[in-house]
């Protein structure tokens, strides 16, 4: 799986539009360090399709998940869910990496939590120009979701930083900055996060 709001289009270019079911994985706090994978919350897959021509593929995936007992939610508006998860990742992943922390870092009051919410709010504003229209209720939902994570857990970008791997920053603040330029919007928090992550990666 790829995070962000461009991944499904990339997959459609490779595998054909009718063969790609849109998916968002959310609610898990898995951490993979070396060969060890740990989690306290399994989460679920949110799946859906943006058009009726893809419904047969969605039905097939739902049937498979029912057979194997995979936790999932069938979404009526998968694009809204995709953007919601994007908003979450832009805030949580990047801020925890930059502050070299854990979920506990953004669960506690302070600058990291404030920066997370500010970065998310820039995505909320941007979504309105992209026809998705996230709301404050969406933002609050994802902030509360983060409060349920293990304080000792960490998102994928922080794990990338610890392993000195290239991160998903282009999929997150990179995308935000590109779309903001397209619409003439100001996104100073994401611009700072992008520059800081690139600086950290250059020091590996």
Residue ranges of each PLM-predicted region?
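Rossmann-like NAD(P)(H) cofactor-binding subdomain of soluble oxidoreductases
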Residues: 1-36
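Internal alpha-helical scaffold of NAD(P)-dependent oxidoreductase catalytic cores
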Residues: 14-21, 34-136
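Short glycine/serine/threonine-biased micro-segments
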Residues: 2, 33, 41, 46, ...
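NAD(P)-dependent Rossmann-like dehydrogenase/reductase catalytic/cofactor-binding core
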Residues: 56, 66, 115-204
């Amino acid at each position: 799986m790829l995070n962000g709001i461009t991944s499904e289009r990339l997959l459609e270019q490779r595998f054909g539009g009718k063969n790609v079911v849109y998916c968002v994985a959310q609610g898990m706090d898995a951490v993979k360090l070396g060969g060890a994978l740990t989690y306290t919350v399994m989460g679920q897959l949110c799946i859906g399709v943006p058009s009726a021509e893809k419904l047969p593929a969605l039905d097939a995936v739902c049937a498979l998940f029912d057979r194997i007992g995979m936790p999932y939610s069938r979404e009526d508006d998968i694009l809204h869910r995709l953007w919601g998860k994007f908003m979450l990742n832009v805030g949580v992943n990047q801020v925890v990496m930059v502050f070299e922390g854990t979920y506990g870092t953004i669960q506690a009051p302070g600058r990291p939590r404030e920066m997370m919410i500010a970065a998310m709010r820039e995505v909320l504003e941007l979504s309105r120009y992209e026809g998705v229209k996230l709301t404050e209720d969406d933002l609050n939902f994802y902030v509360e979701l983060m409060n349920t994570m293990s304080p000792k857990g960490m998102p994928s970008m922080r794990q990338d930083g610890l392993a000195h791997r290239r991160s998903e920053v282009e999929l997150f603040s990179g995308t935000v900055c590109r779309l903001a330029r397209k619409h003439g919007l100001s996104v100073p928090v994401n611009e700072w996060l992008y520059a800081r992550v690139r600086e950290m990666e250059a020091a590996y």
